[in-house]
Design a protein with these regions (language model features):
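Low-complexity, Pro/Ser/Thr- and charge-rich linker/hinge segments at domain boundaries
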Residues: 34, 113-141, 214-215
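Beta-propeller blade signature
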Residues: 149-153, 200-203, 250-261
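C-terminal motif of bacterial Sec signal peptides marking the signal peptidase cleavage site
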Residues: 16-17
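Surface loop/turn motifs at the tips and blade-to-blade linkers of beta-strand repeat domains
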Residues: 163-170, 210-216
C-alpha cells in the first residue's frame, strides 16, 4: 500500500510539473509547419475541433490558442499531435466569431524550449452547413469492392453510412447528388450487380433502369433543376489510360458523350 501511495504521489507531482508554464529559450521568426496546414486559414464558427500535428521532431510540444480572455492550452508528447477538446474549442469559436484566433506553438527540441512565430485562424460569422455527404473508397485505380456513401456531421465529425456496398453484392455506387442540398431528395447510381439509378423522394424510393437503345450508356453525371422535377444527365463512353512516367498516373477520357433530361 505504501508503494502504491508513493507511485500515485510521484504521478501527481509529475503532472503538476508538466502543467506549469515553460521557459522559452529561443523565439523563432518562422511559423510552424503543421499538418493539416491551418496557418492563416478562415473557418466557420461551428466547425469541429481542427486537430493538427507539428511536422518538426520534438520531445514534447504545446499549442496555445487565444482570443481575448478565452485561452486554451494543449499539450502533447513526441508524436506532436494536438487533440483539441470540444468544449474549449466551442468557447474559443464563440469568442472569435467575426475575428480570429491567435495560435502559438512551442516545442522542446535539443534540450530547450522554442516558440514558433504565432499564426492566426480567422473565424467567419456565417456558419457552414452542418452535414457533408461523400463516397468513401480506398485509394487506387482498380479496387472498389469496399465502398459506401456516408454523411458526416461537420460540427463534431460523427460519421454514419447512407448506404454501403456490402448491402448490394460489393458493387460500385457513384454520382450521388442532392436537389438544392435537400437530404429528402437525392439520387445515386448502382453499377454491375443490381445496376440501376436509385431516386429518393422523402420515403419514396424508385429503382430506374436508365439504359435505352437510343442512349450511349446508362445515366452518368447529374444536375438537378431547382424545382426538383427534372434532372439533366450526361451519358458517356469513358475509357481509362495509364501513364508510365507522369506522377498523374491515370487519364480518363470520353470517346463519345451526350446530355439527356
Amino acid at each position: 500500500m505504501y508503494i502504491i501511495r508513493c507511485i500515485c504521489l510521484w504521478m501527481i507531482l509529475g503532472l503538476m510539473a508538466c502543467s506549469g508554464p515553460v521557459r522559452i529559450q529561443k523565439n523563432l521568426e518562422v511559423k510552424p509547419e503543421i499538418f493539416p496546414d491551418y496557418v492563416d486559414v478562415t473557418i466557420p464558427p461551428n466547425i469541429a475541433p481542427l486537430n493538427f500535428k507539428l511536422k518538426d521532431a520534438c520531445v514534447e510540444a504545446r499549442a496555445i490558442l487565444e482570443c481575448g480572455p478565452e485561452k486554451l492550452e494543449i499539450k502533447t508528447g513526441k508524436d506532436a499531435c494536438f487533440v483539441i477538446p470540444a468544449s474549449g474549442w466551442k468557447r474559443l469559436l464563440r469568442a472569435a466569431s467575426g475575428n480570429h484566433l491567435n495560435v502559438t506553438v512551442q516545442a522542446f527540441v535539443n534540450d530547450e524550449w522554442i516558440a514558433y512565430a504565432p499564426f492566426i485562424i480567422k473565424v467567419a460569422k456565417e456558419p457552414v452547413d452542418g452535414w457533408l455527404a461523400y463516397r468513401l473508397i480506398e485509394p487506387g485505380y482498380e479496387l472498389w469492392n469496399r465502398m459506401g456513401i456516408y454523411q458526416r456531421n461537420l460540427e463534431n465529425y460523427t460519421e454514419n453510412a447512407i448506404i454501403e456496398n456490402k448491402m448490394s453484392g460489393n458493387n460500385c455506387m457513384n454520382c450521388h447528388s442532392f436537389c438544392m442540398q435537400n437530404p429528402e431528395k437525392m439520387l445515386f447510381h448502382m453499377r454491375e450487380t443490381y445496376s440501376c439509378t436509385l431516386l429518393i423522394d422523402g420515403d419514396k424510393v424508385e429503382k430506374l433502369n436508365t439504359k435505352t437503345d437510343q442512349t450511349l450508356s446508362p445515366l452518368v453525371y447529374p444536375s438537378w433543376h431547382p424545382s426538383g422535377k427534372y434532372v439533366a444527365f450526361s451519358v458517356n463512353k469513358t475509357k481509362q489510360a495509364f501513364h508510365m512516367n507522369d506522377r498523374n498516373r491515370v487519364e480518363v477520357f470520353d470517346s463519345a458523350s451526350d446530355v439527356v433530361v
